[in-house]
Design a protein with these regions (language model features):
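Pocket-lining segment of extracytoplasmic ligand-binding domains
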Residues: 92, 125, 175-270
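N-terminal export signals
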Residues: 5-24
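Conserved C-terminal helix/tail region of periplasmic/extracytoplasmic solute-binding proteins
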Residues: 305-343
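Secondary-structure end/capping motifs
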Residues: 235-317
Length: 343
């Protein structure tokens, strides 16, 4: 009896000691992590939701919450304020922000999402707009007040040697942009190329001209994944973990875009998966642009970024020039082999 009692007591003790270990393995402690998008939830940013759905962030020890944005410029101030640790924002606007706030940078780019900026102006052909930027002369073009495509126009004007006021701006909000083009209140509007899918669904392709900034010889890096400098300095491992999970999801989104759109629809049930799939096809062209074939996703050519910094500083008459290394910090990028484009 005593032996049986001893054995059962020992078994209970072993179970009690083992239980905390089993519990800790089943529910590892996750680090809360806030990420801001540049805009609303669409196929453009589907990899973030695929990573979330498939548990890649949790696998890296992160409890990631993803919030909609208010534009690719606003993301920078959200991160600088400390409300968000990371986000998606325009790198030209980051250059301008750093130049206006000299000293130790508050925000850095850590992964180049759009290897080329998807900046376009979409114009109505019945208003005489062709793929020649000079056809915009005297026209009325809609754009949000603070929007990166609009902000980058002076770089195109400089490259083409035309005046900044070649056309007239009509300030509107993002939600009204398609409507004013369709109604004919304006002659065209600025877009991210992939954002224009909503307009393409309402007007026939043969009715529209798409003027790409890249066709004017303006080769800019676009939206990048940004991080607060406090985070990159104090906890670079956290940034690296987020980038590993996201990079994995970007690769898988390119390989299986249907799955990526399905994951996005879980978060935003009102989206049309067919429309978002078409949007992603355009997005992918800018994410996996030619440069990525040599250095992989997420990285940059230093000389190209230096030229972009010089261009932004000169065009906007900024008083200081941020160092390229302060704008883009590649130290936390995933291994090159994980970033080589597989599709």
């Amino acid at each position: 009896m005593q032996r049986r009692h001893f054995l059962s007591s020992s078994a209970a003790a072993v179970s009690a000691l083992a239980a905390p270990a089993v519990w800790s393995q089943a529910t590892p402690k996750l680090t809360p992590f806030k990420f801001t998008l540049d805009f609303r939830i669409t196929g453009q940013t589907s990899p973030f939701f695929l990573a979330q759905q498939r548990g890649y962030y949790k696998d890296e020890g992160l409890d990631v919450s993803i919030d909609v944005g208010a534009g690719s410029v606003a993301s920078i101030t959200r991160i600088a304020s400390g409300v968000y640790q990371m986000g998606l924002g325009d790198i030209s606007s980051l250059i301008e922000f750093q130049a206006s706030n000299p000293g130790t940078p508050m925000v850095q780019a850590v992964y180049q999402y759009y290897n080329r900026a998807p900046f376009v102006i979409v114009g109505r052909k019945d208003r005489g707009i062709t793929t020649d930027f000079r056809s915009l002369e005297g026209k009325k073009i809609a754009a949000a007040a603070v929007e990166s495509t609009r902000r980058a126009w002076p770089m195109v004007a400089r490259k083409l040697r035309v005046k900044n006021d070649l056309f007239t701006w009509s300030t509107t909000d993002f939600a009204s942009r398609d409507n004013v083009v369709v109604r004919g209140d304006v002659d065209g509007a600025t877009y991210f190329h992939d954002s224009a899918v909503s307009l393409f669904a309402r007007m026939k392709p043969e009715e529209l001209s798409v003027l790409q900034y890249t066709q004017a010889g303006v080769n800019l890096y676009g939206n990048a994944i940004l991080a607060s400098t406090a985070l990159t300095t104090q906890n670079p491992a956290l940034v690296a973990a987020f980038l590993r999970a996201t990079n994995r999801a970007i690769q898988e989104s390119m390989a299986d875009p249907t799955a990526a759109m399905a994951a996005t629809k879980v978060r935003e049930p009102i989206i049309n998966e067919g429309v978002e799939l078409e949007r992603w096809r355009i997005t992918q062209q800018y994410i996996a642009a030619a440069d990525t074939r040599s250095h992989g996703l997420g990285d940059i050519f230093k000389r190209t970024l230096e030229q972009q910094v010089d261009e932004v500083v000169e065009v906007f008459g900024l008083k200081s020039r941020p160092a390229t290394e302060s704008v883009f910090n590649r130290a936390m990028l995933p291994a090159t082999r994980a970033r080589i484009v597989n599709t």
